[in-house]
Amino acid sequence: MNYQNNGSWDARTYDQVSYLVQYKWGQQVLEWRKWHGNEIVMDAGCGSGLITKQLAKKVPRGKVYAVDIDSNMIKQARNNLQMFDNVEIIRSSFTDIKLPQKLDVIFSNSALHWIQDHRKAFQVFWDMLKPTNSNNKNKDTGVSSNNAGNVSSSQLLIQCGGFGNLQQIITLLERITNSDQFRAYFKNWKQSWYFAKSDDTDKLLKEIGYVNSRVYLNRDCVSLPNHRIYSRFIKTVVAKPYLELLSSDNGDKLKTAFLKLFLDEVKRNSSNRSKIRWLLDFVRLNIVAHRP
C-alpha cells in the first residue's frame, strides 16, 4: 500500500480485517503467473505483509522486496515476515525507491489506487524491470493461459481499485461530508484515490512500451458477516482518508459520530432493513503487462 501520512494506518486492525477481502484478492493475483521459484520480486505496497508471506513461498530461491511507506504497516510486516530470509522489508514510497537489482516481477495488491499519477508509477516500474535480454534466459515467465499468455519477459502483476469502485459507499460518505455537521471539515476535500478506467490504463502501458498487456475491470461485491466486522473494515480502510480530516480536540468523538451517521445511512438504504446485508461494492482493475 501507498499512503499520504506516514504512520497513519491502524496496521494491527488492518492485518485482521484484510483477511476477508484484500488477502483473497492477493491470492488470486499470485495465481496469474507460472512461478519458477528464483524470481526477484517487489511487493509494491506490501501493507502488513500477509500476502507477502505467500509471495515469499513462491520464490524460495529468489528474493522479495516488500515496500510500504507507512511505518505502522512496516512494523506489522516485520512481525509477520520475520521467519523469511528471502524477504527484505523497506519503508519507502514504491514510486521513489531505488533497489540494488532489477526485477523479474512487480506485484501489487490493493495499493495502486492510492497513487494519483499512474503514468509516473508505470514508468518507474518499467525502469525497475529487467529487459528481456537480461532476464537470465528463463524459458517461461508467463502467466496462466486465461490471462496474458506465456511470454519470456519481466512483468507486472497488479490489482487495485478501478473505475466505479465503491461508488455506492462513496455516495453515502459524501452525504455525510456535505451535512451541516461536517461540511466545514471537508471544504478543501480532495479524493485520495484514483480509480482508473481499463482502456486508459491499457493505452498508458502501451505508450510507455509494455507489451502483451491484459487490462480489465471486474465487479466484486463483498458481503461482510455482521455489523461489527463491517464497521471495523469501514473505519480502518474505506473511511480512513475521510476520518483523517477530523483531527481536532474532539477528533475521536467526531470520528465516532461520522461513522455512526454512515452506518445509519447504510441501514436506511438497505432494501431489507430487518436483515441488512453489509455490502462493499468493489470494482477491481486487473493489470498484467510485460517489459520486452
Stretches with model-predicted labels:
Residues 1-12:
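N-terminal, positively charged/glycine-rich alpha-helical extensions of SAM-dependent methyltransferases
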Residues 20-39, 54:
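Conserved alpha-helix/loop element of class I SAM-dependent methyltransferases that forms part
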Residues 40-44, 48-97, 120:
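Class I SAM-dependent methyltransferase SAM/SAH-binding core
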Residues 95-105:
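A short acidic, Gly/Pro-enriched loop at the edge of an enzyme's catalytic core
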Residues 104-118, 160:
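A short SAM/SAH-binding and catalytic strip from SAM-dependent methyltransferases
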Residues 119, 130, 134-142, 148-227:
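Conserved catalytic/acceptor-binding region of the Class I
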Residues 214-276:
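C-terminal helical/coil "lid" or tail adjacent to the Rossmann-like core of SAM-dependent
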Residues 284-292:
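Core SAM-dependent methyltransferase catalytic element
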